[in-house]
Amino acid sequence: SASVQCIFLADGKLTENLFMKVLILSTGTGEGHNSAAKAVKEQFEKRGIPCELADVLNFASDKAGAYGRRIYIWSTVRAKKVFAGAYRVGRAISSARLKSPVYFANALYADKLCSYITENGYDTVVMPHLFPAEAMTWLLRQHKLDVQTYFIATDYTCIPFTEETKVDYYFIPHEELTTEFIKRGIPAEKLVPTGIPVSERFLKLPEKREARGQLGIPADKSCILMMTGSMGCGKHDGEAGGADRRGYPSVYPGGNQ
């Protein structure tokens, strides 16, 4: 993927990959982060580079990790107005100098994460999620840790609290987001437009007619695929109803089932 190639270029390790050991940190608050993490891991492994994918919240405790995932999913699916309000508040209280409660919450497990990184000899940390980026920012301010750090943005915006992180490079979904990230305080020289990492298997897809046959979708009918984010966010109910009235067959996948 472009993100992995840029990591090699930044580290100067295109021909020295034997000295590279990668830790990818994500968490289960929305599966998109994990999908990006798995895609990056796939590319490192393809190149024979030692790589591990870990849930950063498990460094706090297994219970805390499970709790954090449940609260996030509840807030986005069951309490959308509350979540939207939190994002607005986040924009107001967070800056490169003023740190949010999210930053300090992730600092609580940073020492344990630091021990894990040093004991296992990782020299590269990749983060397709805000939480580990917050933890690593605190960690690097408190400890002299010789690692390269990379944040992968998996939203087509600069989400709240990104500006209070400090890592080596930020991989963003599109060059048109560059100005937004700069306005939020991310240095321009640290921004690398790479797109969002996806698995290589999406490059080897069946023909449309064959795929429809596998899914039981009529080959001669129009079909709309609706995709939402954060475990079901979005005004999809009304849109789905409109599609039904126009006579389109509809497919509603969800919950990773």
Can you say where each PLM-predicted feature lies in the sequence?
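Extreme N-terminal starter segment of soluble prokaryotic enzymes
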Residues: F19-L23
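Donor-nucleotide binding loops and adjacent catalytic segments primarily
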Residues: K208-G213, I217-Q257
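Glycosyltransferases and closely related glycan-assembly transferases
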Residues: D111-V125, E134-Y150
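Conserved N-terminal ligand/cofactor-binding loop architecture of enzyme catalytic domains
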Residues: A39-Y116
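Active-site-proximal region of nucleotide-activated glycan assembly enzymes
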Residues: R141-K204
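Catalytic donor nucleotide-activated moiety binding site of glycosyltransferases and closely related
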Residues: H129-W138, P249-Q257
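A short, glycine/small-residue-rich beta-strand->loop->alpha-helix junction that serves as a flexible
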Residues: T27-A36
